[in-house]
Amino acid sequence: MSTLLEKTRKVNRILQKTGIQPVDFNEMASILKDVIEANVYILSRKGKVLGYSILKDYGNDIFAQSKIIPEEYNDKLLRVTETLANDKGNLFKEDKILSDLILTIVPVNGGGDRLGTLVLSRGVKEFTDDDLILAEYGATVVGLEILRSKNEEIEDEARKRAVVQMALGTLSYSELEAIKNIFEELNGKEGLLVASKIADKVGITRSVIVNALRKFESAGIIESRSLGMKGTHIRVLNDKLLEELEKMKR
């Protein structure tokens, strides 16, 4: 039988992957399931099921069946501010399945904020002190991974915005006017462009429009496909483009 130290080391392996592989909350839940020997559910602060792993199927479990749990369930979880161990039939009295299970609820915190909730369930056997130590350590690891995924998202947003700003900076005045009018005409993330129509409207040549589109395409901001006489189909790949163009109108 694995000792507490051996089990802790298994959980710690999740951290060793940090920065090497994308966050996989199902894998994290699976590791916690194996070391704690319980069903494990990782939820975001808003009640989204980030990942889960089932040791034993107890029926139509709301946490496993939903991508986002009902708001009233999540509100109850968020009211749990410290580990609630071995709850049976108190927290979810109205739920026939959950009220028959032994639940342990561990808040997931990080950076001074509530990031989510770790929910553990069993049929009969209560959670021991060793189980609770592993659960709380697991919640800490989950919190670090949620923070990392949030930081990666922020970094990706900043990178996409920087690419758009640099591409806009390479445009001449005429090309910038062409781009503004093109996406005003499209009125969305994709559509059909008739270059001659824009050229007449802005008072520029078609070559200016072509050059502007090429710069954006080479930067990976848009993709375009010629439809011959019908025009050119344009699709926005970087959604920060529309945000930056909108700012220019203010």
Swiss-Prot record:
NCBIfam families: codY_Gpos, PRK04158.1. Residues 1-147 are annotated as: GAF domain. It is found in: Cytoplasm. Residues 195-214 bind DNA. One of its GO terms (molecular function) is DNA-binding transcription factor activity. The keyword Cytoplasm applies. PANTHER family: GLOBAL TRANSCRIPTIONAL REGULATOR CODY (PTHR40062:SF1), GTP-SENSING TRANSCRIPTIONAL PLEIOTROPIC REPRESSOR CODY (PTHR40062). Pfam families: CodY (PF06018), HTH_CodY (PF08222). This is Global transcriptional regulator CodY. Keywords: Cytoplasm, DNA-binding, Repressor, Transcription, Transcription regulation. One of its GO terms (cellular component) is cytoplasm. The keyword rRNA-binding does not apply. One of its GO terms (biological process) is negative regulation of DNA-templated transcription.
